[in-house]
Amino acid sequence: MTPDDFRAWHDAMNYTYDTGAKALGVSRGTYADWLSGRSRTTGKPITISRLVALACAALAAGMGEWATAAH
């Protein structure tokens, strides 16, 4: 998932920085880094992991945490 993909997901979900960070279980700062594509502390490009991409896909599909998902 590229930062542009992440931004598109963020926009499609109508998340704010706070609601998106809470949904993914990360800090607001980490979420902001993913949206910008750069680390706010080093300025270096960041990589959004496959795990995060899969979590985004699950949330977009209306799925919650496994323990609360119908399975």
Residue spans for each PLM region:
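Recognition helix of helix-turn-helix/homeodomain-like DNA-binding domains
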Residues: G25-I46
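DNA major-groove recognition helix of helix-turn-helix/homeodomain DNA-binding modules
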Residues: K44-A67
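A short, Lys/Arg-rich alpha-helix, primarily the initiator
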Residues: M1-N14
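Intrinsically disordered, low-complexity regions enriched in Ser/Pro/Gly/Gln/His and often acidic
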Residues: M1-T2, V26-S27, L59
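Short alpha-helical "recognition helix" segments of helix-turn-helix
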Residues: T19-L24
